[in-house]
Amino acid sequence: MQLCGFDVGLDQRFFLIAGTCSIEGLEMSLDVAGQLKEACAPLGIPLIYKGSFDKANRSSGTSKRGVGLDAGLKILDEVRRQLQLPILTDVHDTSHVAEVASVVDVLQTPAFLCRQTDFIRAVAQSGKPVNIKKGQFLAPWDMKNVIDKARAAAREVGLSEDRFLACERGVSFGYNNLVADMTSLAEMRNSGAPVVFDVTHSVQKPGGLGAVSGGARDMVPVLARAGVAVGVAGLFMETHPKPAEAWSDGPNAVPLKHMRALLETLVALDDVTKKNGFLENNFGA
């Protein structure tokens, strides 16, 4: 699959979707995107910068939502213009799809909306690649139905079917907790879509701090290493210069100062995993 001008697949180095959870202004976005670009370039990691203009799924009605649609798209467009990076953001409503798709390079769907047929059809027919997140309630093999739904919608309007990513972001495990099942990453390959592992949301504790979500950011490197060892096409990791001050999802964000070291480790693992191939493909014979 071609994505933003680079090849995606298990025969390629993983690509990275990274940025702050919420867009926190132009200066912050340019700073974070610039540092990520400096970290990824020498390692040969294709980078897609992400940021959310609206955090529609919040634990509390008083939680900060974000800079809004118009301001958010302007900031992302400026990041792309100044740093020559492809950009991604999430959409939460069919009414936003066309406007967002006119600006960004990749759309992303919230995990909770993966079974909403009209929504999936709308993003699939936007003309842009889509990172489709698996719901926390969904079995990994059921993502094939979601991807098939998106492909059918794309076919209806004459668009390529080869523009969808299947993203794992953890599964609910009791109250206020998620776990990441590494076998899901392999199971989701059967969807026929490149698999992305959302590491930072997989360590989230939804609503775990009462009015806000908690997280275990110290487990991000652990799960990231495990996911790369399984073999994935891409990684998704949110980051922040000062996670404790982040507008949202600070408890599970990678401290920006540690991103380069983490990526160096992951590249080494990725090389070993993909060089040696995937023996599991032969175990059914």
From Swiss-Prot:
Pfam families: DAHP_synth_1 (PF00793). GO terms for biological process: keto-3-deoxy-D-manno-octulosonic acid biosynthetic process. GO terms for molecular function: 3-deoxy-8-phosphooctulonate synthase activity. Pathway: Carbohydrate biosynthesis; 3-deoxy-D-manno-octulosonate biosynthesis; 3-deoxy-D-manno-octulosonate from D-ribulose 5-phosphate: step 2/3; Bacterial outer membrane biogenesis; lipopolysaccharide biosynthesis. The keyword Transferase applies. It is found in: Cytoplasm. One of its GO terms (cellular component) is cytoplasm. Its EC number is 2.5.1.55. Gene3D superfamilies: Aldolase class I. Keywords: Cytoplasm, Lipopolysaccharide biosynthesis, Transferase. InterPro entries: Aldolase_TIM (IPR013785), DAHP1/KDSA (IPR006218), KDO8P_synthase (IPR006269). It catalyses: D-arabinose 5-phosphate + phosphoenolpyruvate + H2O = 3-deoxy-alpha-D-manno-2-octulosonate-8-phosphate + phosphate. Belongs to the KdsA family. This is 2-dehydro-3-deoxyphosphooctonate aldolase. The gene is kdsA.
